[in-house]
């Protein structure tokens, strides 16, 4: 329905009705926009074209019916996100999840109920949240080793990982897509784009907790979700084997090594040690004071690169290849140009060029090290090139 879609797209782009009128060059009034959104009037073809241009969609997208409704699970109670930003975030996520559910139906023919443990694990205590993380690992056959790529694990299990541009106060949110009968068609965990990988991973694991835990009213929901997230990424037995059952001192260098192993920030690692009673409260608080003093709460040293969602790009490319959607539709959803028949390597190359320079340098350096290691181990290439290089004196 035009009225609902118009309002959703406007709010997702953070535009007031006055701002939308200004972006359209004043060809309509604020009152007209209000009537369109209430459904009491319809725009002309000229106005529709301008609305679509400003909102960055095709005119047909404004008339499209939603295949689902989106239900939000929880905001961080301490996020401090303003009401206007909250509305914008909700509409961004609503649009993104609706598009993904529609895409999975068009490309994969998926319209059955989601195979996902929606609020399956009852949690009355924080220890219950710990056990729920162990049960979740068992359900997904994750073993006990650290999870190398959490985003990949989530996407492989039909959880949409959505990244959005949002204020720094926003850390994450989770949501479900449901049909008219209340069946779950999709689940999403949402994180702010641009955060370091260690924070991103805990944010996503925390949001996953909101979707799979049934938390008692008497228990702090955020603490339970964070306990679940920490336990999912650093299982009790594996973590204790690595760190020890009791510690009176933890070195900064060790924390940085553990950060790389478990993919968690130093602050989250220290919290995990405290949760498992590896360190006492006094020592934990002293570390918190030191971290604040050094300005590391938001910007820790040795930051890990963020993990990149792949499902959307992969599904769009498959859909275009199989004729389920056009390159133009793919461009709109992915935010980059896609040519018909374009090779995957070219698309990946342009996606690479959109990364920050520091991240590109890191990836190229890692690739160079891998190639050097390969050639050091495999000497067959020397035979193909005529053997060793010898230097001769004149």
At which residue positions do the language-model features occur?
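Enrichment for repetitive, rod-forming helical segments
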Residues: 12-17, 42, 355, 367-368, ...
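Short linear interaction segments
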Residues: 360-394
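Active-site hotspot residues in diverse enzymes, especially metal/ion-binding acidic/histidine motifs
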Residues: 1-344
């Amino acid at each position: 329905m035009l009225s609902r879609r118009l309002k959703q797209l406007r709010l997702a782009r953070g535009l007031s009705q006055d701002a939308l009128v200004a972006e359209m060059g004043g060809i309509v009034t604020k009152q007209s926009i209000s009537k369109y959104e209430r459904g009491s009037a319809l725009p002309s073809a000229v106005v529709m074209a301008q609305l679509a241009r400003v909102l960055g969609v095709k005119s047909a997208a404004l008339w499209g019916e939603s295949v689902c409704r989106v239900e939000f699970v929880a905001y961080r109670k301490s996020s401090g996100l303003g009401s206007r930003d909250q509305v914008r975030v909700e509409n961004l996520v609503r649009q993104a999840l609706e598009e993904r559910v529609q895409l999975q139906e068009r490309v994969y023919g998926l319209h059955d109920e989601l195979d996902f443990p929606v609020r399956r694990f009852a949690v009355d205590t924080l220890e219950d949240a710990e056990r729920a993380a162990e049960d979740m690992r068992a359900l997904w056959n994750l073993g006990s080793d650290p999870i190398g790529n959490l985003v990949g694990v989530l996407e492989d299990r039909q959880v949409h990982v959505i990244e959005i541009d949002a204020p720094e106060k926003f850390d994450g949110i989770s949501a479900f897509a449901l049909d008219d009968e209340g069946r779950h068609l999709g689940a999403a965990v949402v994180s702010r784009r641009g955060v370091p990988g260690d924070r991103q991973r805990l944010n996503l694991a925390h949001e996953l907790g909101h979707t799979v835990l049934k938390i008692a009213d008497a228990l702090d929901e955020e603490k339970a979700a964070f306990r679940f997230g920490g336990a999912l990424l650093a299982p009790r037995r594996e973590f204790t084997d690595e760190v020890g059952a009791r510690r009176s001192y933890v070195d900064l260098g060790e924390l940085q090594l553990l950060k790389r192993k478990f993919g968690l920030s130093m602050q989250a690692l220290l919290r995990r040690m405290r949760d498992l009673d590896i360190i006492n409260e006094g020592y934990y608080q002293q570390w918190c004071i030191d971290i604040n003093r050094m300005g590391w709460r938001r910007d820790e040293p040795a930051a890990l690169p963020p993990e990149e969602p792949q499902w959307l790009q992969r599904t769009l490319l498959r859909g275009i290849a199989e004729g389920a959607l056009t390159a133009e539709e793919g461009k709109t959803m992915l935010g980059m140009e896609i040519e018909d028949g374009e090779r995957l390597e070219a698309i990946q190359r342009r996606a690479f060029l959109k990364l920050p320079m520091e991240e590109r340098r890191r990836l190229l350096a890692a690739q160079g090290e891998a190639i050097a290691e390969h050639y050091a181990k495999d000497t067959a290439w020397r035979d193909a090139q005529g053997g060793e290089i010898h230097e001769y004196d004149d």
